[in-house]
Amino acid sequence: MLRIADKTFDSHLFTGTGKFASSQLMVEAIRASGSQLVTLAMKRVDLRQHNDAILDPLIAAGVTLLPNTSGAKTAEEAIFAAHLAREALGTNWLKLEIHPDARWLLPDPIETLKAAETLVQQGFVVLPYCGADPVLCKRLEEVGCAAVMPLGAPIGSNQGLETRAMLEIIIQQATVPVVVDAGIGVPSHAAQALEMGADAVLVNTAIAVADDPVNMAKAFRLAVDAGLLARQSGPGSRSHFAHATSPLTGFLEASA
């Protein structure tokens, strides 16, 4: 069971809604993933329509919506988008994203911290997308963020846990949930994140662009469950030396 702020989740896999070929495929994949928390870019929702092709199927699926501020380049823009999301969707939960460079989509640490502090004071449950910077993650935690979402690699790159060493430090020192966000490309990456101590992962591109998104979503669900179970089972420690699994000389001594 994963608890973030006032909500609990059975699934440790969060999913996104972008890049799917259709809204029907998106919903089928989300259901197959078992995800209970789904991110939604406000810039993709047409609030003027009574029947939005993205929003309505998600509401019908019964998932918790996590609107994000993707597209914001400054703290001011993100705060404005956050208030629009709260008014439109009736939720104070927010994935805070501020990335000024459209080529790399790397989060701006200064603007993110500034926006996070303000939004927490304004009553939002803030989950910030951020770089894998242990100092920044601690600062975000200190200003009241409900979780931190450090990247594994650039958004949509499918490179996996390129920031593993920093993620390990973040996980070790965090007192709020750590959700590895961005760069996870295959189910084994998700399993590794849970094994190393992450509380959850957020996956979008790897599922949405797969040849079979529904089965890929199932694969991620199983991988996350496996990674969590492996961690809870207490894996053996790594060693630079070999350790025999059975006696090497006992049978020789017995026959002497």
UniProtKB/Swiss-Prot annotation:
Keywords: Cytoplasm, Schiff base, Thiamine biosynthesis, Transferase
Catalytic activity: [ThiS sulfur-carrier protein]-C-terminal-Gly-aminoethanethioate + 2-iminoacetate + 1-deoxy-D-xylulose 5-phosphate = [ThiS sulfur-carrier protein]-C-terminal Gly-Gly + 2-[(2R,5Z)-2-carboxy-4-methylthiazol-5(2H)-ylidene]ethyl phosphate + 2 H2O + H(+)
Catalytic residues (UniProt): 95
Record InterPro entries: Aldolase_TIM, Thiazole_synthase_ThiG, ThiG
Gene3D superfamilies: Aldolase class I
Primary location class: cytoplasm
TM annotation in the entry: none
Enzyme class at the top of the EC tree: transferase
Gene Ontology terms describing biological process: thiamine diphosphate biosynthetic process
Record's subcellular location: Cytoplasm
Disulfide bonds, paired cysteine numbers: none
GO molecular function annotation: thiazole synthase activity
Binding site for 1-deoxy-D-xylulose 5-phosphate: 156, 182-183, 204-205
EC code(s) of this entry: 2.8.1.10
Domain of life: Bacteria
Cellular component GO terms, alphabetical: cytoplasm
Pathway entry: Cofactor biosynthesis; thiamine diphosphate biosynthesis
A Pfam family assignment: ThiG
Homology family: Belongs to the ThiG family.
Quaternary structure and partners: Homotetramer. Forms heterodimers with either ThiH or ThiS.
Function description: Catalyzes the rearrangement of 1-deoxy-D-xylulose 5-phosphate (DXP) to produce the thiazole phosphate moiety of thiamine. Sulfur is provided by the thiocarboxylate moiety of the carrier protein ThiS. In vitro, sulfur can be provided by H(2)S.
Protein name: Thiazole synthase
